Design a protein with these regions (language model features):
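RNA pseudouridine synthases
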Residues: 1-276
């Protein structure tokens, strides 16, 4: 039953030519299951062992396909290389680039996910934030899903009765010509959009931010890819979210792993803001 519900959520069950959306519907007629064919583009892991691999995900690539019309996701590379038992072990937003861990079989996926859920993984991100940040920050602000009916479904909010969320921010370099600070962000908890919302909360929004600090029509235009690249730059400061998963450390099967991204976030982020 759970597998059938999962397939319905993903739009992969069809009855007499119509996509099934009602989970409790009684079905009769010709029922089809849509099977995905992988569409790899040659992205290779930067590290792998027998049980897992680590990819440096480009910005704009989904970790999982989000429906029948998704042309490409990291899943295409994962299944092509390791088969359909392989899966990502944690989240990484579509526009966030950087390190993402992939279990090669069901057992590895389960055990890796437990490490992330139990906060046994050190994660470090690099971001380019608006304004000058001169000293280390420790941001403690509870978070939850935005509950306003008119709000964007995926957006989070700061609220006293939300879940505990703590982020440490370390300034690395200030660029006066673009009034932005390159920072290292270390989330001590694992809330959705945590770094993004916390930096917005302390008035140092990440450049390129498509959700926080924008009006609903602007957000929808960005998410629906109806906003031009020039307008996106003028609206948010960059044509993509300037947040990168840079370093990850954990212990797995008795071995300590410390994996660093090969992406030069400082140079690339500066060029994206300075030259578009």
């Amino acid at each position: 039953m759970r597998e059938a519900q999962r397939l319905i959520d993903k739009g992969r069950l069809i009855c007499d030519g119509e996509v099934i959306s009602e989970k409790n519907a009684l079905l009769s007629g010709e029922i089809c299951l849509i099977e995905y064919e992988t569409n790899p583009r040659g992205l290779k892991p930067i590290f792998e062992c027998d049980k897992f691999a680590v990819f440096d995900k480009p910005s704009g690539v989904l970790s999982h396909p989000n429906g029948r019309h998704c042309e490409y996701s990291l899943n295409d590379e994962i299944w092509s290389l390791y088969g359909r038992e392989a899966s990502v072990a944690h989240r990484l937003d579509c526009e966030t680039s950087g390190l993402i861990v992939v279990g090669k079989d069901k057992n590895a996926v389960v055990n890796l996910k437990k490490l992330f859920e139990n906060r046994q993984v050190y994660k470090s991100y690099v971001a380019l934030a608006h304004g000058k940040i001169s000293e280390n920050l420790r941001i403690e602000a509870n978070m939850d899903l935005a509950n306003d009916y008119d709000d964007v479904k995926m957006r989070m909010r700061i609220c006293e009765d939300g879940k505990s969320a703590v982020t440490e921010i370390l300034p690395l370099e200030y660029f006066a010509d673009i009034d932005a600070t390159l920072v290292r962000a270390v989330p001590l908890t694992g809330r959705q959009h945590q770094i993004r919302l916390h930096l917005f909360y302390v008035e140092h929004k990440i450049l390129g931010e498509p959700l926080y600090g924008l009006a609903r029509p602007q957000i929808e235009n960005i998410l629906d890819k109806e906003m031009s690249e020039i307008e996106r730059i003028l609206t948010t400061g960059a044509r993509r979210l300037l947040l990168h998963s840079d370093e990850i450390c954990f212990k797995f099967d008795g071995v300590e792993y410390k994996i660093k991204s090969k992406f030069d976030a400082k140079d690339e982020f500066y060029k994206l803001v300075k030259h578009g």
